[in-house]
Amino acid sequence: MNIIPCSIKTLKGLYDISGVEVGQHFYWQIGGFQIHAQVLITSWVVITILLGSVIIAVRNPQTIPTDGQNFFEYVLEFIRDLSKTQIGEEYGPWVPFIGTMFLFIFVSNWSGALLPWKIIQLPHGELAAPTNDINTTVALALLTSAAYFYAGLSNKGLSYFEKYIKPTPILLPINILEDFTKPLSLSFRLFGNILADELVVVVLVSLVPLVVPIPVMFLGLFTSGIQALIFATLAAAYIGESMEGHH
């Protein structure tokens, strides 16, 4: 019978799938530092896409908005509503920060599924979505932490630190720990979801024909958008919380 050859082929296929490598990096040596080139290249591409789209859409504003201008006005209104809901009436100065976070993460996530990164060959590793790398997500989370510390200190001065002993000094260790868990949860949630989504697509493409993974890719686009929304919402909520001084 053909049972043994079929079993051997199945095991060989599983072995090939297990050979999918994660973690190879391409570095630039600048001075005495190693720069993670993959993340920089893909981040520059995402930034170029965002800037180019905005410039093309609003370079000649019309009283009656064109399709592109209308789209970006809708996006701006969405970000303003999100910021106002989470931060409150003093949301205005934070709209650019929240908008930048949301748009960069959104386009980065979608670029992993829509842009043919693998066409560009590197000496080591391969290009992928910027948010597929823990360095990017940690940097975004640390920026968010710096933003809500700045918001609290600029709004309340040194009395901002009184929140650590409210409502009782017993909660001091927990309140301090919370400042570490916030960026950790932000960074690992985003990194884990985007990495898992791309790995699932890679494995499915290795297992089955191209048509079958397409529904999973569409689901990945949806979840990628949701992750950008979650990150921006939490960032705005943390900023609003630090300005109001309650948990």
From Swiss-Prot:
Keyword Ribosomal protein on entry: no
Cellular component per GO, a single term: chloroplast thylakoid membrane
Membrane topology: Multi-pass membrane protein
Transmembrane residue ranges: 38-58, 95-115, 134-154, 199-219, 220-240
GO molecular function, a single term: proton-transporting ATP synthase activity, rotational mechanism
Superkingdom of source: Eukaryota
Extent of the signal sequence: none
Record's keyword terms, sorted: ATP synthesis, CF(0), Chloroplast, Hydrogen ion transport, Ion transport, Membrane, Plastid, Thylakoid, Transmembrane, Transmembrane helix, Transport
Subcellular location field: Plastid, Chloroplast thylakoid membrane
InterPro entries per UniProt: ATP_syn_F0_a_bact/chloroplast, ATP_synth_F0_asu, ATP_synth_F0_asu_AS, F0_ATP_A_sf
Pfam families: ATP-synt_A
Keyword Transport applies: yes
Disulphide bridges: none
PANTHER family assigned: ATP SYNTHASE SUBUNIT A, CHLOROPLASTIC
Function: Key component of the proton channel; it plays a direct role in the translocation of protons across the membrane.
HAMAP family xref list: ATP_synth_a_bact
Quaternary assembly: F-type ATPases have 2 components, CF(1) - the catalytic core - and CF(0) - the membrane proton channel. CF(1) has five subunits: alpha(3), beta(3), gamma(1), delta(1), epsilon(1). CF(0) has four main subunits: a, b, b' and c.
Record-stated family: Belongs to the ATPase A chain family.
Full protein name: ATP synthase subunit a, chloroplastic
Lineage: Eukaryota, Viridiplantae, Streptophyta, Embryophyta, Tracheophyta
